[in-house]
Amino acid sequence: MQVKVIDENSNTTAVLNCAKAKTRALAWLCDTVLLAILLAIIYGISSIFIKEQSSVFLIMTVSQAVLWLTYFVILPGLWKGKTLFRALLGLSLLIFKKRFWNLLVHELFLWVWYSVIFLALAIYFFVNRDDPKILQAFFDNQNSNLSWIFVKILLSVISVLQLVFVVYFCFSSQKQALQDLLSKSFMVQKAIKVKDCKSELKSTNTIKTHSDLPGDIDLEQLGD
């Protein structure tokens, strides 16, 4: 699949390929490893100064949510859909409108749901840190508490959905993955064709996007 991008400022048209699955996976893996290293550093520092496990768990959960939100939502929103390793590998996530919202939707089943659930659990464990049976109850498969059962079912459902996303992703090389379809976005690679489009702009209907995207995206020109 290709995306045609028209830049009115330079009067050029760029034809972009949807990214290959292996390139996307490599960028995501490298980005995740980078964040995991930062998270490990935070854990090491927290463990030195804080001995209470519930407090460390809360700090780690909040840190993970903030790091991932900053890196996978805020940074791409401000930097034309790029993260550090997307930029190094020539990738960019194009989003037509409601950028930050659709970036959040794009990451929803990758880490957002897990972050929200574990943040809620971390707060609950911290509030009830004086009760040693709370954490034990969560890992007790015989526990009939409806709240715990609901949380476990929710985590299981999200895990299954994640698996579906991963399987679909493996067969969506140079096409939109499920998270792209949900967020109305395209993960694209370097331009394969750039030409003057001054005359073409006069006869082509375009849809305005954010000014810091590569240009105006001609939806009628999208094709396989």
Curated annotation (Swiss-Prot):
Amino-acid biosynthesis keyword on record: no
GO cellular component terms, semicolon-separated: plasma membrane
Q: Which domain of life is it from?
A: Bacteria
- Its membrane topology, per UniProt? Multi-pass membrane protein
Compartment(s) of residence: Cell membrane
Record-annotated membrane-spanning stretches: 25-45, 56-76, 107-127, 149-169
Record keywords: Cell membrane, Membrane, Transmembrane, Transmembrane helix
Stated name of the protein:
Uncharacterized protein MG243 homolog
Its lineage reads: Bacteria, Bacillati, Mycoplasmatota, Mycoplasmoidales, Mycoplasmoidaceae
